[in-house]
Amino acid sequence: FNYCTYSYSMAFWDWKRWEKELDWMALHGINLPLAAVGHECVWRNLLLRLGFSKQQINNFIAGPAFLAWWEMNNLEGWGGPNPDSWYEQQEALQKKILQRMKEWGMHPVLPGYSGMIPSKLDLGKRIDSGKEKKTASDTSSESAQSTLNKWNGFDRPGILLPDDPKFTQIANLFYEETEKLYGTSDYYSIDPFHEAKSLPAGLDFGKAGRAIMDAMKKANPKAVWWYKDGQKPTSGNDESAESRRSAYP
């Protein structure tokens, strides 16, 4: 699987359909599948923990058929909002999927943290020395985040730069909320700056890669960064894509 598969084909699969798929995968020797169902539940819990309102969360998390591109930092909020019942359903479904994957000897690849954040909300108002604050502001924080170019006409989420202290703080919260719902994994899928035509000024790919790796390793020292080699930007700049790949640890 890649993320797109989850929206192209699997957005509304129930357990019966997933059970059939997982059994087929086991019969064909697949042992390292991406397990992205219910990733939005992690983000919902993280944002609630930071004091975001339901409306603010709805403006960030995409609807079921667009979750793949939201997870790849390409868009936010499109196709939503999702009802509370959706999050409850998908959390329960992911837990069944993970259990069956492990029963068949598979190693699930869970989504990791790339630096993505809501584009128009000030995280600095909510974080102080790693502790959440229950205050909110709808103003953007230039020091906390940067923005990437539009993706196929969609406004992209914000991105925390690796030298911003809030990167580590949000990453820690992300992995904590992931573990609460789904446990830890030995493999995490992280595709930073996906299909970006332009990047924040002064961005150091090496620093970004180390920050991503360090946060993942803090969650699980044995974890492996699972990187999908589909980083060619929509402008077709192969040199830029290669510089990103070579910089990551």
Task: Give the role of each language-model region.
Residues F1-P249:
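Aromatic-lined carbohydrate-binding surfaces of glycoside hydrolases
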